[in-house]
Every structure is written in C-alpha cells, then in structure tokens.
A protein has these predicted regions:
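Conserved adenosyl
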Residues: 135, 142, 146-286, 291-293
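Conserved Class I S-adenosyl-L-methionine-dependent methyltransferase catalytic core
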Residues: 27-32, 38-60, 64-65, 80, ...
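Core SAM-dependent methyltransferase catalytic element
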Residues: 367-404
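A short glycine-rich, Lys/Arg-flanked "PGG" loop and its adjoining helix->strand segment in the class I
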Residues: 292-304
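Long, low-complexity, charged/polar intrinsically disordered regions in eukaryotic proteins
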Residues: 2-43
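Short acidic, hydrophobic short linear motifs in intrinsically disordered regions
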Residues: 71-79
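Short helix-to-turn junction characteristic of helix-turn-helix DNA-binding domains
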Residues: 66-70, 224
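C-terminal alpha-helical "lid/dimerization" subdomain adjacent to the S-adenosyl-L-methionine
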Residues: 311-366
C-alpha cells in the first residue's frame, strides 16, 4: 500500500486507500459533512458573539448616540456616551465589520474614521413604536437567559423547572417589548376582521375585558385603546410584572386611567364573576402548569355570549425535522425558558412553547369549550376563539392561576 502525503485535515482518508474508491468516497462525504456542520456551529457562535456586542450597544447607549450625533469619530461617540475611547473604537470597528454600522474614511487613521448608524438599522434597534423593533430579541437571550444558564443545567437534571421570576427584569422587559408591536400594529385588525361580532359588542358602553397573565400590561393598554368604552382589567400573579404594568398605565394618558386597572393575584379572586365579554390570554397558556384549570377559571369569568381569545405560537400541526425558522425559534425558546417555567410548579402539564393546535383543542375541550382556530397569516402567532360548549356546565371550583411566563 502506497501512502501519499495529504493535508492533515484529510489524513483519515489514508487508511481507506487499500479498500477501494467506494470506501474512500464515503469517508470523503463524512469528512465534508463534519466540516459543514463545524462551519454551521461557527456561524452560530459568530452570531452569538455579535448579538452580545449589540447588547453592549443598547445597554451603553451607543446606538442612541450614533443616531443623535450622526457620522462622527470614535472619540466623539465615547465622549457623548461617557465611555472609554479605546474600547468604544473597538466596538465601532466590530459593528462595522458586522455590517451594523457604516464607516467613512476606512483607510484613514483610526482617530479620523467617521462612523454612522443607518436609519433602517436605527429603527430596528431603537424605535419602540416600530413594528420592526427587534432590540428585545437582543436583550432576552443575553440579559435574561444567559444569566440563568447554570440554573437551567440543574433544572434539566432535577426536572424541577425554573420560576419565571428567576429570569429577571431583562427577560420580563424583553418579552413585553417583543410582543408590544403585535398588540399595537396587528391585534386591533385581527379582532375586527376575525371576530366582528365581539368587536361590535365591545364598543357598547359597559363592556368589560379581562386580560389574564397580562405581564407588563402592554396588551391590556392596547385593548383599552381599541375599545374606548370598555373597562379593561389586567391580572397577573407576578408582582414585578404588575408593577411594570402600573408604571406603563401612568404614562399612557389620562383617558385610560379610569378604565384600566391591574391586579396582582389570582384572577379567580375577581369579585365581578361572569362579567367579561372577552377574556384574553396572550402568549401565556403554554407556560402554565395547569392550562385546563386556567381555562376553566376563564370560562367562569365570561358573561353570557362571551368568548375567550388565545394568542399562541403559530406552529405546525405535527412535528417535523425541517420546520420553518419560526418554529425553530419557538423550540429554542421552549428549551431555554417556557418549558422550564411551566415545570416550576407541580403537577405540571409540561406543555412548552410548541403547543400545537390539537393540544389547544384538547385543553379547551376538557375545560368545556369549543375551539375555532384563526390563522391570521402571521409567521409567529395564531389566534384561537374559545366559546363555552352548551352541554358543559360552568365549573364551580376554580383553581389558582399560575404565573404568566
């Protein structure tokens, strides 16, 4: 057997020389597959590192300075942001090679280069009112999930999950921001288009809406703006979320103050039973340890002719190894957050983010609802309209509602 000199990375091919061309071809394919997978992980690692650098830009106010000051030098950016000049220049150069920031005078001396943030990038990073605002997706994994990774390791070993509060303020604010654009830009149209009967009834003075697991209240405030004659009540067991919601209400305008209120606690403690025309759970049911009991509590709160509206992740009817990227995202979020949160209470349904339509139908059926699936054409969200089944009695016992995410 004659061995030819080869590149070290192909050294494993040598042992197949005596086995013929087919074996060598198979090994080459295996090597190529490993190489391609390694490159894929490198790309993921690079994206993670660049996301961390974006987190620095948001937390340190660097993007804000770039937008306000315009094309300028690293020294000027550092001065306006009150940061170390050398570290600021390194960040600006990194942002340039990442394609986030532009540079004028690439070949000039470092101190003479002028950096700028393109308007479209500024909108995605800084404009909270834009439906393209993506900054929360930077904050959530870096500021929220990364901090609890050691606890997640333990949670996977014990199966005890991880409470929502453990993820902290960054995760709480990131979640609110990520869905805030949906509530503002899409939810009004969805309700009027797909639920015109409920939309009309909610415009009659005296109508009442309950927003269960309301989080920081952005969905509650959006509902109040949608229906200016309705009373809207947001409820959440997480005290920090309700504090955020009340802060948001305080800055939302005096026209909402008399119609919106927030309660920290169990929705079943609400004294006005059977009074709500619409009970909402937005992006929350899949996180709850006892989803059927939650839906039973919501059913008890409905006025005659009232409905429950769910917004949940838009995922496929069944598992597939090659789903769209949106479902890949939902699985990653489930692994890192939603499933551990849902399993932090026992007993738990352990649903996870990827709650498929048949699972929703099953939970709703057990709670005494008929289900209408509403495909709104959004890559990340789907609506479900639940109406009480005529043959199912209203439950007399209402279980405690778990926290929102």
């Amino acid at each position: 057997m004659r061995l030819h000199p080869v590149h070290p990375s192909l050294g494993s091919l040598r042992r197949f020389d005596s086995l013929g061309p087919i074996a060598a071809m198979v090994d080459r394919r295996s090597h190529r597959s490993v190489h391609e997978f390694s490159l894929r992980l490198f790309d993921a690692g690079l994206a993670s590192a660049e996301l961390m650098a974006c987190y620095l830009g948001l937390e340190l106010g660097l993007y804000r300075v770039l937008r306000e000051v315009g094309p300028t030098t690293a020294a000027q950016v550092a001065r306006h942001a009150d940061l170390n000049p050398r570290m600021t220049r390194e960040w600006l150069e990194q942002q340039t090679v990442a394609g986030i920031v532009t540079v004028d005078g690439e070949g000039d001396k470092p101190q003479d280069r002028r950096f700028a943030l393109p308007d479209e990038h500024a909108e995605a990073l800084l404009d909270e009112d834009s439906e393209h605002w993506i900054a929360p997706l930077v904050v959530m994994p870096i500021g929220g999930i990364a901090a609890v990774l050691p606890q997640l390791v333990d949670a996977y070993r014990t199966g005890e999950g991880l409470p929502y509060a453990a993820y902290g303020e960054a995760m709480r604010g990131g979640q609110a921001g990520l869905n805030g654009g949906v509530y503002k830009h899409h939810l009004p149209g969805w309700i009027s288009r797909y639920m015109p009967d409920i939309d009309a009834r909610l415009r009659v003075p005296g109508a009442a809406i309950a927003d269960i697991a309301c989080g920081s209240g952005l969905s509650t405030l959006a509902l109040a703006r949608m229906f200016p004659d309705a009373q809207v009540h947001g409820v959440d067991l997480d005290d920090a979320s309700i504090a955020d919601a009340r802060d948001n209400l305080a800055t939302a305008g005096s026209d909402l103050a008399g119609r919106v209120r927030f309660t920290a606690g169990n929705a079943s403690d609400e004294p006005l039973t059977a009074s709500y025309l619409l009970v909402c759970l937005f992006d929350a049911l899949h996180d709850m340890a006892a989803p059927v009991e939650v839906l039973r509590a919501c059913r008890r709160m409905l006025a005659p002719g009232g409905v429950v509206l769910l917004m949940e992740p838009s995922v496929g009817e069944r598992f597939t190894a090659t789903p769209p990227d949106s479902e890949r995202f939902h699985y990653a979020v489930s692994v890192l957050h939603c499933l551990p949160v849902g399993m932090s209470e026992t007993p738990s349904a352990a649903t996870g983010t990827v709650m498929r339509p048949e699972t929703v139908r099953g939970y709703a059926r057990e709670a005494g609802f008929d289900t209408w699936v509403i495909d709104v054409g959004h890559p990340f969200h789907r609506l479900y309209r639940l109406t009480p089944s005529p043959e199912s009695p209203v439950p007399r016992v209402v279980s405690t509602l778990p926290d929102r995410k």
